[in-house]
Structures are given as C-alpha cells and as structure tokens.
Amino acid sequence: MKHTTKAALLADIETTHAALEATLARVPSSQMSAPGVTGEWSVKDILAHIAMWRSRAITQMFKAEQGQPPKMEIPATLAKAANWLDLFNAQEYAAQKDRPLDRVMADFGGSHRQLVKRLRAWGDEAALFDPKRYPALNGR
C-alpha cells in the first residue's frame, strides 16, 4: 500500500489533482470533447469517468462511516459477466458522453472537493488503511 497516513493520502490527492488541473488548463475547450484521446473517449469523457468513480467512492465511504460494508452496485445484467467492469464502464460512458462540458467540469471539481472533504472528516485513520477491514475489497 502506497499511503499509510491520511495526511500523505490527502497530500498525494491534492498534488495529483493540481497537476491534472494544470494540464487541463492547456487544453483548449474546443478540444475537450474531441474523441480519440483513448479509444473513442475524449478528455471530457475521461473527466466524467473520474467524477463517476469518485462519486462511487464517496458513497462507499459514507456507508462505511455508518458501519455498512462496501458493496459495489452492479446492474444485474452485468453481474455474472467475467468482464463486468469493462461492460459497466462502457455503460457509464454511453450514459455520460453527451453531457455538456460545463456540467462534466462541475462534477469533476465537485467530486474532488467532496472526496477531500470526506477524507478530512474520516475519523478512524487506522480503518482507512486496514487492508483486512473489508474482505470484499481484496486489500485495496
């Protein structure tokens, strides 16, 4: 595990986010929705993807704070597929690809702020880094 303290994790998140924001500042807004950055995905699509996964992490953290074990909500149509994660990501891409850039950017920034806020408020630092706390996460 890379991080062993909340302070180190938060510092890494903030540093990485600042570097990404600096890179994004150099991308003209006219290019943000252009496909082909990775496969058919645009920069906007990648940011929507990051925001979606951050939001899911925030939800899982909230549940954990309430004493509930983490549970990945997988649509029943995908749950039995060996490549369910790829299928899920493709489904989420399809659902978000036509969203306006300003909404995606708002979600991207908001999900970052909310994740940092939730981590700062997390009370049990030992539990945050205990790979055995939630067996379903396989040590992640």
Question: What is the role of each PLM region?
Answer:
Residues 1, 53, 109-130:
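Contiguous hydrophobic segments
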Residues 1-8, 56-110:
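Short, helix-capping/interhelical loops that line the mouth of catalytic, cofactor-
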Residues 12, 16-20, 30-31, 77-88:
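N-proximal short alpha-helices
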Residues 16-17, 21, 100-102, 111-112, ...:
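A general secondary-structure boundary signal
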Residues 10-14, 47, 51, 102-105, ...:
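Short amphipathic alpha-helical segments with heptad-repeat character
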Residues 2-29, 52, 56, 62-63:
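Alpha-helical bundle segments that constitute or directly flank the non-heme di-iron/ferroxidase center
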Residues 18-44, 63-71, 118-139:
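Helix-loop segments that flank and shape redox-cofactor active sites
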